[in-house]
Regions:
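Alpha/beta enzyme core
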Residues: 1-142, 153-169
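Short Gly/Pro-enriched loop/turn and capping motifs at secondary-structure junctions
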Residues: 103, 147-152, 176-178
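Residues in flexible loops and secondary-structure boundaries
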Residues: 106, 150, 184-185
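C-terminal helical cap(s) of enzyme catalytic domains, especially alpha/beta-barrels
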Residues: 163-166, 177-187
Length: 187
């Protein structure tokens, strides 16, 4: 448990050698763009990614906007989510996981650019496409979190939007595990 005033951060609990010992093909790391601890996290994953690359291990980065510089609506705003995906790509991720975004634009400066350049964010597929573009124009694998448990139709709609937008997959853990086994398997 941490206080509400503590910066959003993650603890490193294992290293690259631990991943190799366990037979893992990749290391994983969560960053929180927008957190006061963000730069520290970027430095930590940069060092771990370099070590992993030297040892032939891929890197997965969960890039979830949150923290002191991000509003609650901003955590899923398209400008913030696309930038978070881009940050993960810049940090060397082979695989990037981000949240599906809304059409909300958190940053006033970004709103002007999106409007002036006519960047399409009207549909979920368009927003996925924008996040893929932000991840080195599709030269990184980008998967999207499934979010809170929801109805089957909503899960399928998200999966179709990810497919249509050029994303590489949807992680639907809660949408599977919070159902009965027969329901989850049928889905």
């Amino acid at each position: 448990l941490m206080s509400d005033t503590a910066g959003k951060n993650q603890a490193i609990t294992a290293g690259v050698d631990d991943a190799l010992r366990l037979g893992c093909a990749a290391i994983g790391f969560t960053i929180y763009p927008g957190s006061d601890a963000g730069l520290e996290m970027f430095e930590e994953i940069s060092a771990m990614r370099a070590e992993a690359a030297a040892k032939g291990v891929a890197t997965v980065i969960w890039s979830y906007p949150r923290g002191e510089a991000v509003t609650k609506d901003g955590e899923t705003a398209i400008d913030v989510c696309a930038y978070s995906a881009h940050i993960a790509a810049l940090l060397g991720a082979h695989i990037i996981k981000v949240k599906l975004s809304t059409d909300h634009l958190m940053q006033p400066e970004a709103r002007k650019v999106y409007e002036d350049r006519g960047i399409d964010i009207a549909t979920q597929a368009a927003r996925v496409r924008h996040c893929v573009q932000a991840s080195f124009a599709g030269r990184r694998i980008i998967v999207f979190s499934g979010g809170a448990a929801k109805g089957e139709d909503a899960v399928y709609d998200d999966a179709r939007a990810i497919r249509d937008g050029g994303g590489n997959g949807s992680i639907i853990g809660r949408n599977s595990f919070q159902r009965s086994r027969p329901e989850a398997l049928a889905m």
